[in-house]
Amino acid sequence: MKKTAFLLALLLAAVFILPADAATYEAEGLFRLRYDEAAYTLDDQTYAYESETGASRWFFVLYNDEMTFDMSLLRMENDAGLTLSTAAEERRQSYLKELLDWYQDEDASLLETVEAGDGQTPFWVLGLRNEFGPYLMAETVIDGNAIDLQAYYNDSSLAADERLQEALREMLAGFEQDGETPVLEK
């Protein structure tokens, strides 16, 4: 009886919790991101040619009629080896200060820290505004690589509100570190 109840509960959880149209984007050696393929269109080709070599790498945009998520990486020579999930609290705070200083021209403010779906990757979520309008950015660092996930409404007149922030949290819930160092040519 207990086994039957457990299996029924597991089946119900799978039906109601897991997206029916789950897809996975994989940045080999770095991370995987599960997302709802029915809700978002993936474009991982448009800017791929711009990041084949060098210190930066564009991964993709996920978008629908209302909002867009844009993910990229920047290798930080001065922070080689830094991983936020394993860094001492003092180092994490000094990096956060550097990050906020870097984006001061975009009125950066720390909104929250979100633990990714793997339970081991902290992302700082910043509220920002540039010449294109308001947006959110979630950033973490893995082995000296800053990984950014930007979120914005396609209508740039809309504020980066709680609804957009919740959509960003949901996207981060599908993030999982791969645990290996990505290979980027200089």
Model-inferred region functions:
Residues L8-V15:
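Bacterial N-terminal signal peptides
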Residues V15-D21:
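C-terminal segment of classical bacterial N-terminal signal peptides
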Residues A22-R57:
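N-terminal "mature-domain start" segment
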Residues L30, T86, E90, L158-E166:
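Soluble non-cytosolic domains of exported or imported proteins
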Residues D43, L99-D107, L172-G179:
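Sec/Tat-exported extracytoplasmic proteins
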Residues A48-A146, S156-S157:
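Conserved polar/disulfide-associated segments of primarily extracytoplasmic proteins
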